[in-house]
Amino acid sequence: TTYGKILYPAQSDTIAFYLNGYMEYAWRHVPLSLGHSPKPIPLVVHPNSVLSNGFVTWGPRRMEIVSQHDFNASPEPWLLTLSLHENRHVVQTDKLNRGIFRAATYLLGDQGIAPAVGLVPLWFLEGDAVYTETNLSSGGRGRQSSFYQPFRTHLLQHGRSIYPYDKWLMGSYKNAIPNHYQFGYMMVGYGYLKYESDIW
């Protein structure tokens, strides 16, 4: 495949077939807004789980997809959402791998990129990925009304934002604060609206 090897159990060839199509779409379209094409990455499929998730990790460098559909997701195919979201993380991380951080990968291997990723706020990485999954599909979390519910609740209760940035950033056990996906999507959306593609 153009994006790398796909590893899956033998009985899951139908899931792998669909996922391959979504990954090919994502691999062509996700890098365009960052102007960076990443190196191919292995994809590991986990079809037998009650969880629904995916992640990209750099030690060793790979993407893992748990193919069980999320019960809270949009009607869009779950594998498409995951493909777009996780591909964005691949492009983000690969783009950060330059300069002094690239030199660190020669010394530390795949883990040399960790300091660069650690310097970027989690809300920015996740918000950018949610923004991408929403823009490149007809679904995505950015189109779900439940995704905005914490913000609506806060504004209806208080009329304006009464919390400092740190509280929005770190969350709270006392007050309902949006998670880093929701907060990041709103921040990144505003960033793209104001600065267009110069946000990165």
Report residues per predicted region.
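Internal amphipathic alpha-helical segments of the cytochrome P450 catalytic fold
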Residues: A16, S197-W200
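Acidic/His/Gly-enriched intrinsically disordered linker/tail segments
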Residues: P60-M63, S74-L82, V90, L96-G189, ...
